[in-house]
Amino acid sequence: MAELISVRVKPGSRKGPLVEAGEDGALTLYVQERAVDGKANEAVTKLLAEHLGVPRSRIELVSGATSRHKRFRIG
């Protein structure tokens, strides 16, 4: 069963790679890669997979390819 997860992304961050959970449970992912040629999206997918303990192949970007607010399907 697939699950959808929404995250906020901070590309080009000096803090990254880091995952923070807010008080409301929302995840913010900090990555060092800049949002150029999909590099930040690749880094976010890798970081999310590590954080959730699932293979990268099970994570699919559903929406937000050019936005800081992204939705992923975990399958």
Swiss-Prot record:
- Protein name stated in the entry: UPF0235 protein Mflv_3569
Q: Which InterPro entries match?
A: DUF167, YggU-like_sf
Per the record, the similarity remark reads: Belongs to the UPF0235 family.
List GO terms (cellular component aspect).
Answer: cytoplasm
PANTHER family, per the entry: UPF0235 PROTEIN C15ORF40 (PTHR13420:SF7)
